[in-house]
């Protein structure tokens, strides 16, 4: 394919760029954002440059961080903590379409937040972003509890977020409730497999500390496409709710998480994101059981 040149004289060697798009198969050595900055971000920076060259039009798959988890695994809490904004909450499926979250660190004191869907850009703000996501989802997937594989893009520019792009997928549920389609499990499964099957996808599997990891449907799906776990990273939520045996769970690694585990405490009640992080740090430093977990694999930030 050789080098390619943009009209603004910005030059990238596409072959060299593609050669760097390999998943590093070594143990994870830092919490989620540090791990991202050290190992995944350089890869995705290359991806962004290649996207600017429209290489996907040539049929080349580019890496994506795909967030999966069973319903009620705490997936929304993890994403909220990373973005510092509220996402839709409630009973049933909160995420009904693929939500492409683009976080960008900004020096401006005022955050910029907008949605992109149906060929339009819709500005919003921190107070109304959850409502805006719900409204956009209704446009894409219809009102009710159905799902759609048409993506919705959420862009967030703030001074306290990591530079990070992820695709959040609906939580996995086996039993339809509250008017959900009878085949809701099959619909969500197809959507998830579509995103995690490509070898270029990095799977961020959100697991609740309160359950047996081997019974998680998200683990079963990710192991179908990544048997050795070489491109799977696990975030273990609700560590404060089930501290007994958590160290053994992440040490034994019965479910083959090749990129390692990160244990976190979910935000509780009316805590601000800053307060939640302080309490998380205190928990993992002082709890008689959780303090035994390596400090390099605890904490969302």
Curated annotation (Swiss-Prot):
Pfam families: Dynamin_M, Dynamin_N
Dynamin-type G domain ranges (all copies): 59-301
One GO location term (cellular component): cytoplasm
Region (G5 motif) residue spans: 270
Classification lineage: Eukaryota, Viridiplantae, Streptophyta, Embryophyta, Tracheophyta
MF annotations from Gene Ontology: GTP binding; GTPase activity
Listed InterPro entries: Dynamin, Dynamin_GTPase, Dynamin_N, Dynamin_stalk, G_DYNAMIN_dom, P-loop_NTPase
Binding sites annotated in the UniProt record for GTP: 69-76, 168-172, 237-240
PROSITE patterns: G_DYNAMIN_2
Assigned protein family: Belongs to the TRAFAC class dynamin-like GTPase superfamily. Dynamin/Fzo/YdjA family.
Transmembrane segments: none
Protein name: Putative dynamin-related protein 4A
Annotated spans, G3 motif: 168-171
Region spans: G1 motif: 69-76
Keyword annotations: GTP-binding, Nucleotide-binding
UniProt keyword GTP-binding, yes or no: yes
Organism: Arabidopsis thaliana
Location of the region described as G2 motif in the Swiss-Prot/TrEMBL record: 94-96
Signal peptide region: none
Region annotation G4 motif: where it falls in the sequence: 237-240
């Amino acid at each position: 394919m050789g080098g390619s040149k943009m009209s603004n004289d910005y030059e990238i060697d596409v072959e060299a760029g593609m050669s760097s798009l390999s998943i590093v198969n070594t143990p994870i050595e830092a919490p989620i954002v540090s791990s991202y900055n050290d190992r995944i971000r350089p890869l995705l920076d290359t991806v962004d440059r290649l996207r600017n060259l429209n290489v996907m039009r040539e049929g080349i798959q580019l890496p994506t961080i795909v967030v999966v988890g069973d319903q009620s695994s705490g997936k929304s809490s993890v994403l909220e903590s990373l973005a510092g904004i509220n996402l839709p909450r409630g009973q049933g499926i909160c995420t009904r379409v693929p939500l492409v979250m683009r976080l960008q660190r900004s020096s401006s004191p005022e955050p910029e937040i907008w949605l992109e869907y149906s060929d339009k850009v819709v500005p919003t703000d921190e107070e109304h972003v959850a409502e805006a996501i719900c409204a956009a989802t209704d446009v894409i997937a219809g009102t009710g509890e159905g799902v759609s594989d048409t993506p919705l893009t959420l862009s967030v520019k703030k001074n306290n977020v990591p530079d990070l792009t992820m695709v959040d997928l609906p939580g996995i549920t086996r039993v339809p409730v509250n008017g959900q389609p009878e085949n809701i499990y099959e619909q969500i499964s197809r959507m998830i497999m579509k995103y995690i099957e490509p070898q270029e996808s990095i799977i961020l599997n959100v697991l609740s500390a309160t359950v047996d990891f081997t019974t998680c449907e998200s683990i079963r799906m990710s192991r179908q496409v990544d048997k050795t776990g070489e491109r799977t990273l696990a975030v273990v939520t609700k560590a404060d709710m089930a501290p007994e045996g958590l160290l053994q769970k992440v040490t034994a690694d019965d479910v083959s998480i090749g990129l390692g585990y990160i244990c976190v405490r979910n935000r509780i009640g009316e805590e601000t994101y800053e307060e939640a992080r302080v309490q998380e740090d205190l928990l993992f430093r002082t709890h008689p059981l959780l303090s035994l977990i390596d400090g390099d694999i605890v904490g969302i930030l």
